[in-house]
Amino acid sequence: LKFEYIFRQVGFVILLAIIVAALVGLFSQGVVSSAEKINATKSVRLDYERFGRRQTESRMQLNFLVKAAGKSTISLTAENSNAYEPGSVWPQPDSMYSHGGTLYMVYDELKKGDSISVWIFITPSRAGKWNNVIRVNNEPGIQFWQFIYP
């Protein structure tokens, strides 16, 4: 009988810990999961979720200031090219292509001084910890990681 009581108490503590972890975002969106990274020159900012679930869409917001009128290219490189399936991008780029494990999004008609915010939606197709790099033009890249639960 004492064993059953102890087992019930331990089970309650474990269940409570799982619920608290989920509420703070350890398994997806939340305080622990939400992250912001800025590149070395402080010209590009990325808001994203550190934790996600396989086959569940997640979003990233990339903010940058256009330094020269004309074409701007955003590149997203994942450690494993099969780790993510690209989804929608808003605003839509004028062209988009991939080469060597890197996804390129090209915006042709941007004006100097514009503050641009791009939303990128991706769906993780594999579980694990993935290291990624996102870059705008020739600016220093932002390295970030995501842990994807099965």
What are these language model-derived features?
Residues 1-39:
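A eukaryote-biased signal for short, well-structured alpha-helical docking elements
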Residues 147-150:
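Short beta-strand edge segments in extracellular beta-sheet folds
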Residues 79-93, 142-145:
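Short aromatic-acidic-glycine turn motif
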Residues 128-143:
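Serine/threonine-enriched low-complexity regions used as flexible
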Residues 97-99, 107-114:
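Short proline/glycine- and polar residue-rich coil/turn motifs
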Residues 73-83, 136-139:
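Short acidic, flexible loop segments centered on an aromatic residue
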Residues 40-76:
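Short extracytoplasmic
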Residues 111-128:
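Low-complexity, intrinsically disordered segments enriched in Ser/Thr together with acidic residues
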